């Protein structure tokens, strides 16, 4: 019942809905902890939400939604690269939001990296809104599984890269490493990075 109330408003975000797949509600993923495991689970969770009928999905907050993780931070043990990587991943998702003010916890250099990716997300805004309108008409998720978009091309178990709408293949580095392999579907692809 509570989630149905959200249908009365043009803007909404829910973290836990039951039997609301297919409705015009933004479904935010459940809280992830501040850890690399939390970052690794972002893409598979977004893909799963879309396949379950939640066309409008929002990842958990950048760096994880457990605010307690950011209280009394020991800067010597705090891994700023996790926040930066999380921000980079979120920049190519339908929505992005910080769990803690980045200027409170990041060095000037890492803050500038996050600012760059927030601006990228802003630049993607018109495209993301176009995809939201498309989702309203078709029910297709904005974040789409590779196998959904390219059936029969061997993407059945691919859960670490996705299509943002039908135009952008997104393959983020989701661990503390600096590179990854990307599996491309048939056709011609352009690296816009």
Task: For every predicted segment, state its role.
Residues 1-193:
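Catalytic-domain carbohydrate-binding cleft regions of carbohydrate-active enzymes
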């Amino acid at each position: 019942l509570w989630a149905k109330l959200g249908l009365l408003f043009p803007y909404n975000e829910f973290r836990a809905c039951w039997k609301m797949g297919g409705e015009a509600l933004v479904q935010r993923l459940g809280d992830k902890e501040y850890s690399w495991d939390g970052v690794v689970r972002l893409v598979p969770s977004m893909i799963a939400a879309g396949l379950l009928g939640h066309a409008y999905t929002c990842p958990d907050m950048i760096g994880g939604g457990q605010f307690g993780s950011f209280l009394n931070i020991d800067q010597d043990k705090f891994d700023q690269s996790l926040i930066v990587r999380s921000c980079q991943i979120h920049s190519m998702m339908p929505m992005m939001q910080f769990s803690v003010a980045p200027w409170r916890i990041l060095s000037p250099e890492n803050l500038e990296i996050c600012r760059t990716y927030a601006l990228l997300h802003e630049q993607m805004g018109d495209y993301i809104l176009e995809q939201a309108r498309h989702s309203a008409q078709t029910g297709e998720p904005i974040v789409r599984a590779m196998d959904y978009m390219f059936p029969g091309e061997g993407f059945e178990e691919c859960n670490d890269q996705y299509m943002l709408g039908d135009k952008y293949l997104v393959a983020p580095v989701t661990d503390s490493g600096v590179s990854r392999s990307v599996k491309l579907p048939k056709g011609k692809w352009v690296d816009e990075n």
